[in-house]
């Protein structure tokens, strides 16, 4: 972090990208500025964004490889120049781009002699290779070579204990960190009481997303971290201000479902699809990934079930509740809907 004195003028707080370039397929660079900030604010924003960029951005990588009957990772395979450990290290370096959630399967199946590169990986449709020229192994003889791979989207650095896997399956220490480096510098402007700061932020990524995309995701994650404090303030409002408002203390889908089961007339809940509820695309996709397709599926879930869904957030919970209240008012729920 660097501080310098520069001349400048006070203006409305704004940010912009002042430099963007692609150094290689696996190295993107972006430089951004945010100004004007009061003294000390640039440090606050810079530190928070740097931590969020390096530790909170999700990435996709290969987490496991299965070779067949290989006694240990230091073994060599006849006809292949690299050892199993070297192949695992090469697979660890493969950069993938995707929006998948959960674990997916991939594979490599080729016949030598030939070089094996990232383009030989057979991937699910939702996954894309950033640099297809990344090396994996060299087959020096005419042999058949197949590997089963496991792909996962996560964040940070994940390690697994090394074991002697008799089925030839070996974990790969996953580095789910699309942001390679972050640096920020602070420039002071003006004199006396008019002094303010400009924050310069530099971001390097591995090509699976652009620096601008990384900055947006990091900012979104920081906002999500502070949302509970805003909700706490709302919950602390006086009873007089809220006595006519209905805010469920918990996501009481299960309680609502119990009430619905008591009624036997009306439209079956399994005939109402979540497509009809006008949910946001993000919430809709979360539910679809969890095989929730109808209102019956949704109301059968508890709050804990929903919060266990990958990428499902507290605000998604509130959005679903508000949507149900909008389209299925309480009197209709009590008098019209049943199984």
From Swiss-Prot:
It catalyses: RNA(n) + a ribonucleoside 5'-triphosphate = RNA(n+1) + diphosphate. Residues 264-339 are annotated as: Alpha C-terminal domain (alpha-CTD). Residues 1-233 are annotated as: Alpha N-terminal domain (alpha-NTD). It is found in: Plastid, Chloroplast. Belongs to the RNA polymerase alpha chain family. HAMAP family: RNApol_bact_RpoA. This is DNA-directed RNA polymerase subunit alpha. The gene is rpoA.
């Amino acid at each position: 972090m660097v501080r310098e004195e520069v001349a400048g003028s006070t203006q409305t707080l704004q940010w912009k990208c002042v430099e963007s370039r692609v150094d290689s397929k696996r190295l993107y660079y972006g430089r951004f500025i945010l100004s004007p900030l009061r003294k000390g604010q640039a440090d606050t924003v810079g530190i928070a964004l740097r931590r969020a960029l390096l530790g909170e951005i999700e990435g996709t990588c290969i987490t496991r490889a299965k070779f067949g009957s290989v006694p240990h990772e230091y073994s060599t395979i006849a006809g292949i120049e690299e050892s199993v450990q070297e192949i695992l290290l090469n697979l660890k370096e493969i950069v993938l781009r995707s929006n998948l959630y959960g674990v997916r399967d991939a594979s490599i199946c080729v016949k030598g002699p030939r070089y094996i590169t990232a383009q030989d990986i057979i991937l699910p449709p939702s996954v894309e290779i950033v640099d297809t020229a990344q090396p994996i192994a060299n087959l020096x003889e005419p042999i058949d070579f197949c590997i089963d791979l496991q792909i996962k989207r996560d964040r940070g650095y994940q390690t697994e204990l090394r074991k002697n896997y008799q089925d030839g399956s070996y974990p790969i220490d996953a580095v789910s960190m699309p942001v390679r480096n972050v640096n920020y510098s602070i420039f002071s402007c003006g004199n006396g009481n008019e002094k303010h700061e400009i924050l310069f932020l530099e971001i390097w990524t591995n090509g699976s997303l652009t620096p601008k995309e990384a900055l947006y995701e990091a900012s979104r994650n920081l906002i999500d971290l502070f949302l509970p404090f805003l909700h706490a303030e709302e919950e602390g409002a006086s009873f007089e201000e809220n006595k006519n408002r209905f805010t469920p203390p918990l996501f009481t889908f299960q309680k609502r479902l119990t009430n619905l089961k008591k009624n036997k007339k009306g439209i079956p809940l399994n005939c109402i699809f979540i497509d009809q509820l006008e949910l946001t695309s993000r919430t809709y996709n979360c539910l679809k990934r969890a095989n929730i397709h109808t209102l019956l599926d949704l109301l059968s879930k508890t709050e804990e079930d929903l919060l266990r869904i990958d990428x499902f957030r507290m605000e998604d919970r509130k959005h679903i509740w508000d949507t149900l209240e909008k389209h299925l008012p309480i009197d209709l729920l009590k008098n019209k809907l049943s199984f």
